[in-house]
Amino acid sequence: MSTINTGINGFRSHWPYCLACSLENPKVKVVAINDPFIDLEYMVYMFKYDSTHGRFKGTVEHKDGKLVVNGHEIAVHAERDPAQIPWGSHGADYVIESTGVFTTKDAASAHLKGGAKKVIISAPSADAPMFVVGVNLDKYTSDLTVISNASCTTNCLAPLAKVIHDNYGILEGLMTTVHATTATQKTVDGPSNKDWRGGRGAGANIIPSSTGAAKAVGKVIPELNGKLTGMAFRVPTPDVSVVDLTVRLEKPASYDEIKATIKKASESEELKGILGYTEDQVVSTDFVGDAHSSIFDAKAGIQLSPTFVKLISWYDNEFGYSTRVVDLLAYVAGKDGAL
């Protein structure tokens, strides 16, 4: 089987998980990593130990200036300017842009100067086309050189919203994500001029925050453009988040009918492994390490009337999202004829 030679720019946040996910996907081979702020020895440490997901079960070391994972050597660079990263010299045709800095088409296109042929941004983008696995991959065309995998929350919300809209029609809706702490937050109160609440201590507060995840669904499902918006609450847990989608339906349905529809969709070829379904009495830690984008919690939702319903879906905002980035990469490469 042929493999996709891949580069990663930014070895922080969820990217140790993405590298781990790539090891499980025989179609993807990471050949180079760039991060100007992390030295090689620390990179080994970050990959080996994780407070939430535990120790890496394989082998990781550094040798001759390279990161070696399960015996596989990965070149490491420390360039600040994406245009200076020599992706081409490593045969890395595809690059995952994960710094959270170069999120526009223009900024991410700098990787093309170093020899990359395609860039996948692991964050929402203001102008790059966004794709969500299981939702709108049919819209991808090979002429696109910079694309976005949207956000972890959009990846949770969009599959659920698509199933509901396709079967019952969504007239309008509000989304709230109860979101685990992320590395951008403050451990204790500190300066945050643009977001005063965001400057408060993450471990001591439930923090209301903004999110563009619901509006972004309108970009991947155009029929829902302008019909959804939302907000977030940041909570002091290390991983796993949950979406609360409250919608007004066009077609009346009982909650049991809605559950059955979602369960059937979760077993379909299109959404199997993407949208999960559970009737267990679960809590957030039950989903640590879950690779689904979205796991519908049938016991947590409620209904006020046949056209007004609240739906709940969980997601591992680290591991689940990282898995989807690798899946998107493999899909795109297949469509490009690289596999």
UniProtKB/Swiss-Prot annotation:
D-glyceraldehyde 3-phosphate binds at residues 151-153, 182, 211-212, 234. PROSITE patterns: GAPDH (PS00071). The active site is at residue 152. It catalyses: D-glyceraldehyde 3-phosphate + phosphate + NAD(+) = (2R)-3-phospho-glyceroyl phosphate + NADH + H(+). The keyword Lyase does not apply. Pfam families: Gp_dh_C (PF02800), Gp_dh_N (PF00044). The record marks 179 as: Activates thiol group during catalysis. Pathway: Carbohydrate degradation; glycolysis; pyruvate from D-glyceraldehyde 3-phosphate: step 1/5. It comes from the Eukaryota. It is found in: Cytoplasm. Its main location: cytoplasm. SUPFAM superfamilies: Glyceraldehyde-3-phosphate dehydrogenase-like, C-terminal domain, NAD(P)-binding Rossmann-fold domains. Its EC number is 1.2.1.12. NAD(+) binds at residues 13-14, 35, 80, 317. Homotetramer. Belongs to the glyceraldehyde-3-phosphate dehydrogenase family. This is Glyceraldehyde-3-phosphate dehydrogenase 3. It comes from Mucor circinelloides f. lusitanicus. The gene is GPD3.
